[in-house]
Amino acid sequence: MSLKEKTQSLFANAFGYPATHTIQAPGRVNLIGEHTDYNDGFVLPCAIDYQTVISCAPRDDRKVRVMAADYENQLDEFSLDAPIVAHENYQWANYVRGVVKHLQLRNNSFGGVDMVISGNVPQGAGLSSSASLEVAVGTVLQQLYHLPLDGAQIALNGQEAENQFVGCNCGIMDQLISALGKKDHALLIDCRSLGTKAVSMPKGVAVVIINSNFKRTLVGSEYNTRREQCETGARFFQQPALRDVTIEEFNAVAHELDPIVAKRVRHILTENARTVEAASALEQGDLKRMGELMAESHASMRDDFEITVPQIDTLVEIVKAVIGDKGGVRMTGGGFGGCIVALFPEELVPAVQQAVAEQYEAKTGIKETFYVCKPSQGAGQC
């Protein structure tokens, strides 16, 4: 049974009438451009065919009822006329409440709604299940009540909800790609202007995500340290963000910087340049060049930004040995575990899967999870 059928059937059973709309919003993977978002730089994600789906209908009062199919059909109810505060027990409900609350601040011309939510974006894998949920809820209200909001505004609303209501720091990339993703394309995003450019993906190329299943422990504290180091670098150059520093300016005075800060800055500057070039390489179908850029990105994350772990490096090496110069592979996400992303011709999928199955657990003692994805459409009706 599809997620659409599941949520529609549950909606009718739970609420006693049929849903009027079913909305989806996808998860995402970032192909290249790591830790560049909070430096006002560039990222190149694509939406994937794992999504959050919501069957819904407007109500003629001011009540919101939400059922979470993936959490034992837990039900949350709240009123649009009372202050919206955090739910004491259901963490999932706070993503919904946060989106609704922040949407009220933007445009209060919507009424009540009934929703049933289900999703298949793997949680905790760095594939943005939370952003997918936020964008789906925002799109539900926009569609049911014809709110004059575009995808970027729905994305910004989701980011605000996560930062301010849920209390989790995140950049804008995850929500933006979920809202604006385009089938068979990646999206080059300028994280300063929020300008986007759709980049066509070569035909017959698989987007493969492999979860190392290495439990991330350092990610919070180390993430904040990296942000501070980048801000220190920007201050040294008297610029608002590292986006505004050229590699030539950096090379001329790198020796004056603290050696660790210099390494962090070098990663951001070179990663930004790689990301812009990667968009061109993809558009031209040049998988060999894309592979070189992804390899450089991984080496930079490993050696200059120091956010990879041995298990991730091992996974990358296993995949690279199979695909050679026919594609690329690198760590994706915040670091210290999580996933790798690989782009290569579809016909190599079985060989890559076999090599990883035979070697990764033997070398690390951990079993991987393997996802073959398609670049997918952003949020909308399904």
Curated annotation (Swiss-Prot):
Its EC number is 2.7.1.6. One of its GO terms (cellular component) is cytosol. InterPro entries: Galactokinase, Galactokinase_bac, Galactokinase_CS, GalKase_N, GHMP_kinase_C_dom, GHMP_kinase_C_sf, GHMP_kinase_N_dom, GHMP_knse_ATP-bd_CS. It comes from the Bacteria. It is found in: Cytoplasm. Keywords: ATP-binding, Carbohydrate metabolism, Cytoplasm, Galactose metabolism, Kinase, Magnesium, Metal-binding, Nucleotide-binding, Transferase. The active site is at residue 174. GO terms for biological process: galactose metabolic process. Mg(2+) binds at residues 130, 162. ATP binds at residues 124-130. One of its GO terms (molecular function) is magnesium ion binding. Belongs to the GHMP kinase family. GalK subfamily. Catalyzes the transfer of the gamma-phosphate of ATP to D-galactose to form alpha-D-galactose-1-phosphate (Gal-1-P). This is Galactokinase. It comes from Escherichia coli O6:H1 (strain CFT073 / ATCC 700928 / UPEC).
